[in-house]
Design a protein with these regions (language model features):
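Tandem repeat scaffolds
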Residues: 186-290
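Hydrophobic scaffolds flanking metal-cofactor catalytic centers in soluble metalloenzymes
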Residues: 2-189
Length: 290
């Protein structure tokens, strides 16, 4: 499946990729306040939920942003809110920040993780909608996206009542269908292999696996543990990577064009180089080898 097979012209919704990326200029530093973290390989210190990070400044900017990795806060450079931060700050709470009211702050801290999950679902649904292979379920995908958008636009007290688990289950059902449709499209284009079975590594333990130059086209890698896996020069075109743990995976020279349900969070946690090929919707991390 080639990048050109992403059919943007038939999308029925008005969501754009930029709506699903962090806009820190319009956020009240929610990821630096609402979320907890503990001392680990990703964080040099611990912080409880609802406690502002010691590096958060009065203007909601990070005081060590340019040196986060050097300061032991690699986890901060990996995180992506999918646009939930600015939605909560500017839409849900109408530009009134958490410093103005302790009661409002508590609600905001609880709303943010829910909004984060909903926006992540929007990312996946938006991607599925522009895939030509998923044209047969496009109407249902669009209806589910519209419902997800509606949930993100509820009042704060209503968002807290959303059954995220049930909604995610419905979204996941459609994403699974999309994944299978993409695989059928891939299989049709494999010369002489029209009956080839899909490589299934769903939830597999592939930590540290030696997969250099592996042919993983269209593979099901949903939820696979690929921590520190050697994926140099691997062919991952059209592979389903939703939920795959790619921390410290080596993607130097790998081809991930057309891979589906891959997010910036996952890519930010990997190693890569100038020859790593990514889907157009994703950015090359600053820490990758030039």
């Amino acid at each position: 499946m080639l990048e050109g097979n992403r059919d943007h012209s038939h999308a029925l919704h008005n969501i754009h990729w930029d709506d699903l990326r962090a806009d820190c200029e319009n956020c009240f530093g929610l990821c630096c306040v609402a979320l907890p973290f503990a001392v680990s390989a990703d964080f040099a210190m611990s912080k409880d939920a609802g406690v502002p990070c010691s590096n958060l400044q009065a203007d909601y900017r990070c005081g060590i942003h340019v040196n986060l990795r050097e300061c032991g806060c690699k986890g901060c450079t990996v995180f992506e809110c999918f646009g939930a931060g600015q939605k909560v700050s500017q839409i849900t709470f109408e530009g009134i920040d958490w410093r103005e009211s302790s009661e409002r702050a508590k609600t905001m801290y609880h709303v943010f993780p829910i909004m984060h999950q909903l926006h992540e679902m929007l990312w996946y649904l938006h991607e599925a909608l522009v895939l030509e292979a998923a044209c047969s379920i496009r109407q249902e995908l669009n209806m589910t996206l519209e419902e997800t958008v509606r949930l993100t636009e509820l009042r704060a007290d209503e968002i807290l009542k959303v059954d995220v688990h049930a909604h995610r289950a419905n979204v996941n059902r459609l994403l699974l269908q999309t994944s299978e449709l993409v695989w059928m499209d891939v299989r049709r284009n494999l010369k002489g292999n029209s009956k080839e079975r899909r490589k299934n590594y769903r939830g597999a333990d592939l930590m540290g696996a030696k997969l250099k130059s592996a042919d993983l086209r269209g593979a099901d890698l949903r939820g696979a543990y690929l921590i520190a896996a050697d994926l140099r020069h691997a062919n991952l075109r059209a592979a389903d990577l939703i939920g795959a743990d790619l921390r410290d995976a080596d993607l130097c020279g790998a081809d991930l064009r057309d891979s589906i349900f891959l997010t910036q969070v996952q890519i930010n946690a990997t190693k890569g180089d100038l020859h790593t090929q990514l889907p157009g919707r994703l950015s090359r991390p600053a820490h990758w080898i030039a």
